[in-house]
Amino acid sequence: MNVEPMYLTIFLIAGGIIFLVLFFHYVPFFLWLSAKVSGVNISLVQLFLMRIRNVPPYIIVPGMIEAHKAGLSNITRDELEAHYLAGGHVERVVHALVSASKANIELPFQMATAIDLAGRDVFEAVQMSVNPKVIDTPPVTAVAKDGIQLIAKARVTVRANIRQLVGGAGEDTILARVGEGIVSSIGSSENHKSVLENPDSISKLVLRKGLDAGTAFEILSIDIADIDIGKNIGAALQIDQANADKNIAQAKAEERRAMAVATEQEMKAKAEEARANVIQAEAEVPKAMAEAFRSGNLGIMDYYKMKNIQADTSMRENIAKPIGGATSKPLSD
């Protein structure tokens, strides 16, 4: 039995299998066949070179087929490969271009890739251009001129502005500007009743301010969904001011009382000092009388006259006192 032809046959079969595996790995034949059937002009060599460049054909070729079927013949394989190698999402870009074409929205390929590379979902942006998005704002608190606090909630309908998606502000900026406009509108109202009666006045005033300037969206409408009455901020501020004024008045009154007490104590000290001076002066009287007797300037009759005057003065003082007071001293001889 000849064994060599059998080994040769096995070797050829194994080699053929390995060749077919490598061929279908590096050259996606069925993908090429699908592209040919769809009318996309691409060769097996180009598919093989995609593998060499680490570009997956199963991403590029379906995108080319979708674009060709949608009538977007200006999209080339090289552009899709370049966008993939730049880190973009080929599927999103192709879907967005097809949707924009069907909706008659002008969206060049370069703009779509720029939006995608900027980190935004270009397909979602196109969908928002066709179907506007409704954004609910968080509760916005504002105070009218009469001091009543109002809590408002709004619904903002926006549409994506494709030309502003690169470099334009996002939803957070829209919400912040709308909240600022609501606060300004309520704050300029004379009273809270006028706001409750005409909530659409807030929407009209906010829309006139052009809050979507420099953003990636176009504001279509602003609707006030709900308005609640909060605290009476004006009354609370008046109460706080009254309490502050009361505390200030009490502090000033306490200061005046302390000054009055200090003045009273000072006057008492001065009175005690005056009494001490009087007592000291009275202590000098007997000495002066003795000196007058010795010098002959004061006679005995003058002395008795002085004593009588003192007795009369004491009697008058006792008469002027209430009943129960001390009796007058007897006249001295």
Curated annotation (Swiss-Prot):
One of its GO terms (cellular component) is membrane raft. It comes from the Bacteria. The chain crosses the membrane at residues 10-30. This is Flotillin-like protein FloA. Found in functional membrane microdomains (FMM) that may be equivalent to eukaryotic membrane rafts. FMMs are highly dynamic and increase in number as cells age. Flotillins are thought to be important factors in membrane fluidity. It is a single-pass membrane protein. NCBIfam families: PRK13665.1. Belongs to the flotillin-like FloA family. Pfam families: FloA (PF12127). Keywords: Cell membrane, Membrane, Transmembrane, Transmembrane helix. Homooligomerizes. It is found in: Cell membrane; Membrane raft.
